[in-house]
């Protein structure tokens, strides 16, 4: 597959979600990705069986890779991996902390032997901290970072974000860091050692509630489908469905009142004449606006919102997403048939990438063992 990273070779000692997210983006960009799997396979292969008997996770984040089974307890297989790494540009791994070092594949040893190699270690908790050795999974990180605490409604208690955001975001952070390391290597000729943790990734995303608590002295509230710092920016109910409406400036607030609600006086109400006041008086604001919307249809209001150029979004089901006007899908070949997946976001020179094939377990064992034979 051609692309910006054509000619780049990646060895991925990976499992589950975070590292495969990083390497599938590298594969989409044209890199050759060799996925090393335990003899029984990456356990994400058995998360579910929704796609022709195959896992949704595995189909999504393992396209364009070569699958090679290795048993790292066997010296011959460990030597095979070492020979692959001798020719690799990038090594991505998310085994348990310390596992690669015990195998002789730690970053210090590898970069001593291969100075141009970029090593990316993905862990649950931050390297060098007391929690680094702990096991960590997506939901645990959502809980530990406070993300679960700020997610949900006032009466719901802490909630999980609806997707595996810790894993997915960490994979993207690793992908970005690897690309930066490739650019640096082009200038210096030297590889890099990258350490990325799920905790650091989500903690970085938590900076707004963190700064609110640290410097504003306020523990952020769970607001459900509402923005904690902007109002009105939340869900309103109509006769035939729900819509999130977003007002981003004082000018838009006046336009909403005058052109959508036909109520210029509301725009001058001293309780609501600045964003700070509107967020402070959010309950009264939402009650006032909801009273204006009661009995009206979504089409009636969205026509006014479109004309006034006020942003909104309908509350969609996943079924709605399947038929959404903005949704793009691409075909992916799997061992059990062609699946349609939602497309990666980048459109380059008017084109979406061509996605590679999802490998069967050990599909490339023979060819890779021959290619990297001693």
What are these regions (language model features)?
Residues 1-187, 334, 360, 364-374:
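N-terminal helix-loop segment corresponding to the beta1-alpha1 unit
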Residues 127, 155-163, 186-202, 221-228, ...:
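Conserved Rossmann-fold dehydrogenase catalytic segment
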Residues 231-308, 312:
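Aromatic-enriched alpha-helical interface/lid elements that frame and gate functional surfaces
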Residues 171-191, 204-214, 258-262, 267:
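Oxidoreductase and adenylate-handling cofactor-binding alpha/beta cores
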Residues 40, 124-126, 198-203, 240-242, ...:
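Glycine-rich beta-alpha junction loops
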Residues 33, 306-321:
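Short, well-structured beta-strand/strand-turn elements
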Residues 1-9, 221, 237-238, 316-374:
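Terminal low-complexity tails and localization/encapsulation signals of metabolic enzymes
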Residues 156-165, 237-241, 350-352:
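Flexible glycine/proline-enriched surface loops and loop-helix/loop-strand junctions
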């Amino acid at each position: 597959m051609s692309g910006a990273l054509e000619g780049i070779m990646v060895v991925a000692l990976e499992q589950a979600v975070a590292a495969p997210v990083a390497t599938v983006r590298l594969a989409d960009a044209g890199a050759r990705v060799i996925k090393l799997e335990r003899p029984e396979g990456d356990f994400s292969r058995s998360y579910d069986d929704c796609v022709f008997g195959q896992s949704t996770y595995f189909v999504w984040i393992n396209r364009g890779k070569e699958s090679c089974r290795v048993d790292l307890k066997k010296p011959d297989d460990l030597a095979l991996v070492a020979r692959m790494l001798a020719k690799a540009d990038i090594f991505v791994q998310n085994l348990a902390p310390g596992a690669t070092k015990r195998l002789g594949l730690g970053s210090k040893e590898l970069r001593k032997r291969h100075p141009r190699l970029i090593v990316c270690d993905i862990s649950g908790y931050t390297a060098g901290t007391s929690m680094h050795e702990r096991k960590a999974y997506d939901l645990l990180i959502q809980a530990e970072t406070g993300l679960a605490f700020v997610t949900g409604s006032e009466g719901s208690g802490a909630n999980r974000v609806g997707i595996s955001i810790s894993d997915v975001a960490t994979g993207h952070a690793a992908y970005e860091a690897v690309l930066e390391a490739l650019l640096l290597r082009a200038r210096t000729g030297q590889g890099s050692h990258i350490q990325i943790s799920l905790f650091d990734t989500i903690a970085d995303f938590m900076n707004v509630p963190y700064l609110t608590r640290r410097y504003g002295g306020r523990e952020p509230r769970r607001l459900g489908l509402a923005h904690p710092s902007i109002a009105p920016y939340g869900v309103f109910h109509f006769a035939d469905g729900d819509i999130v409406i977003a007002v981003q400036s004082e000018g838009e607030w006046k336009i909403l009142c005058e052109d959508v609600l036909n109520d210029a006086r509301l725009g001058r109400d001293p309780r609501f004449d600045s964003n700070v006041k509107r967020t402070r008086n959010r309950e009264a604001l939402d009650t006032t606006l909801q009273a204006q919307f009661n009995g009206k249809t979504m089409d009636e209001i969205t026509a006014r919102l479109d004309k006034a150029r006020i942003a909104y979004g309908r509350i969609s089901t996943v079924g709605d997403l399947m038929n959404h006007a903005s949704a793009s899908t691409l075909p992916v070949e799997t061992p059990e048939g062609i699946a349609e997946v939602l497309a990666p976001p980048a459109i380059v020179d008017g084109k979406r990438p061509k996605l590679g094939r999802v490998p069967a377990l050990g599909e490339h064992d023979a060819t890779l063992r021959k290619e990297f034979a001693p």
